[in-house]
C-alpha cells in the first residue's frame, strides 16, 4: 500500500469516525406533540418481489401466477401481448439461491417443443457444462453459451418426449461444477410439482 493511499484511507477513517461522533452527540429536536418527525425512516421490504400485472409498467416483468415452486413471469407490453415464461429459483442443499431456470413454449413442428434459459453463477466451470437428469431418465448434457455480469447462461431445447417427461416427473437434478473446485459438483433439485399446469398457462398466454 503506498503512503498516499494510506493517508487517504486514514483520512477517510477519521472522517467517518467524526461523522459518527457528531451524529451521536447532536440531539434531534423533539417533535411537537402529535406531530411525526420528518427525518425518520419507516423501513422498506428488502425483498419486495415482482409487481402484479396491474402494477407493472410497460417493459417490466410481473408475476402472473404461482404453481407450487414455479412462477409464471410475463413482460408487460403496450399492446397487451405479454410474453410469458415459467420460472423457478434453484437452491443448494443449504437453502442458498444458486441458479435459475425459465422455460417457454416453442412453435409446433420444430425439433424443440420447448426452450429454456438456465443461469448459473459466474464462478461456474463452463467446460464441465450443465447436466440434467429427470427422475431416472438418461442424463443430458448442455453447453454454456455466454456469460454476463449476472451469471453464465445455457440455452436449452427440449423435445416433445423430454417435455412429456417433465410433465410426468417428480423432480429433475441440474448439476454444475464450481470453477474453484473442479473435482466437485453441485446438484440442484428442480421440483416438477405444478409444472404441467404452469407450462399450460404459459403456452395459453403466449398464444394470445
PLM features per residue range, with description:
Residues 1-25:
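Sec-dependent N-terminal signal peptides
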Residues 4, 24-208:
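A generic "folded-domain core" signal
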Amino acid at each position: 500500500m503506498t503512503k498516499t493511499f494510506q493517508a487517504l484511507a486514514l483520512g477517510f477513517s477519521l472522517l467517518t469516525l467524526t461523522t459518527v461522533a457528531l451524529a451521536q452527540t447532536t440531539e434531534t429536536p423533539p417533535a411537537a406533540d402529535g406531530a411525526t418527525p420528518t427525518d425518520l425512516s419507516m423501513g422498506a421490504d428488502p425483498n419486495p418481489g415482482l409487481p402484479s400485472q396491474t402494477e407493472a409498467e410497460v417493459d417490466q416483468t410481473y408475476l402472473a401466477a404461482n404453481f407450487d415452486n414455479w412462477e409464471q413471469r410475463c413482460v408487460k407490453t403496450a399492446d397487451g401481448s405479454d410474453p410469458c415464461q415459467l420460472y423457478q429459483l434453484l437452491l443448494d442443499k443449504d437453502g442458498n439461491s444458486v441458479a435459475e431456470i425459465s422455460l417457454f413454449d416453442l412453435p409446433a413442428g420444430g425439433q424443440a417443443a420447448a426452450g429454456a434459459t438456465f443461469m448459473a453463477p459466474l464462478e461456474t466451470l463452463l467446460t464441465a457444462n450443465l447436466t440434467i437428469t429427470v427422475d431416472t431418465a438418461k442424463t443430458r448434457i448442455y453447453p454454456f453459451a455466454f456469460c454476463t455480469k449476472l451469471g453464465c447462461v445455457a440455452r436449452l431445447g427440449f423435445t416433445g418426449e423430454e417435455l412429456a417427461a417433465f410433465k410426468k416427473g417428480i423432480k429433475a437434478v441440474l448439476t454444475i461444477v464450481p470453477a474453484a473446485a473442479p473435482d466437485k459438483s453441485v446438484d440442484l433439485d428442480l421440483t416438477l410439482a405444478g409444472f404441467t399446469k404452469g407450462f399450460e398457462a404459459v403456452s395459453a398466454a403466449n398464444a394470445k
